[in-house]
Structures are given as structure tokens and as C-alpha cells.
Amino acid sequence: MADQLTEDQISEFKEAFSLFDKDGDGCITTKELGTVMRSLGQNPTEAELQDMINEVDADGNGTIDFPEFLNLMARKMKDTDSEEELKEAFRVFDKDQNGFISAAELRHVMTNLGEKLTDEEVDEMIREADVDGDGQINYDEFVKVMMAK
């Protein structure tokens, strides 16, 4: 499954993996998974976190290593994001629920994920997605970017 990913996708997933793997030991624990999910406004129980880990923990050691993470991401990409998942993701970014993601909102979520971006990087991300040029990302623009991944 993971062998159908491009090099770009793999390096993107490596970056995502390192956001989760806070201590850099090459494994994602339930604690690390919980930290990231809470920073995104989710509130999973210990049992839910354990279930998520168990779902992809091929070797049964209780953590997710990078190959297991890649398999998870490849599977997730195959069941391309449902409308509901996209709406949920958009809501995470659209803090004031006004239907637009501003540069400030994008920076806020990325900072919560531990991703410190310069103003230029944030502006560049907005520009890439901002089809109508109004300086923010609406839902349709967000969907386009997510589907292009």
C-alpha cells in the first residue's frame, strides 16, 4: 500500500510524523498522539487513543513507527477524504467560524502543532490556496488544496 506513494508524499508524511513524534525517538505513543489531537481541539479518551494506535500498530508494540504511519496515511488517502472529514478539518482552522481561514488562523493552528512558520511562509501557504485573491481561504479553496494532495 505504502509503495504507491510518491517521494514527495513520503517526505510530507515524514514531516507530519515528526510533528507527532515529540521526543524524536521514531515512535508515536498514545501520549504524543493525544497531545497533537488536543492541540487541534479534539478531546480523545485514553481508550480512543489506544484504539487508534492499535488500528495501525502492525508489530503490536503499542506505538506507531514510521512504516506503520505510512501505511495508515496511504490507507487514509485511498478512502479519499469524505465531505464530513473535510468540513471538520476546515472548522479546526476557521477559529472564528466566519467561513474563511485567515493568515492568523492558519498560523495559530500550525503553531499549536509545533510548526513555527515565518509570516512569509504563512502568506505563501495562503497564496497557494487563495484562488479568488481575497487574502484568505474559503471552503471551496480549502477542498481544492486538500484534494490535490
From Swiss-Prot:
Induction line: PCM5, PCM6 and PCM8 are not induced by touching.
GO molecular-function term, one example from the UniProt record: enzyme regulator activity
Binding-site list for Ca(2+) 4: 130, 132, 134, 136, 141
Gene Ontology cellular-component terms listed: cytoplasm
Role noted for this protein: Calmodulin mediates the control of a large number of enzymes, ion channels and other proteins by Ca(2+). Among the enzymes to be stimulated by the calmodulin-Ca(2+) complex are a number of protein kinases and phosphatases.
Family listed: Belongs to the calmodulin family.
Protein name: Calmodulin-5/6/7/8
The species this protein was found in: Solanum tuberosum
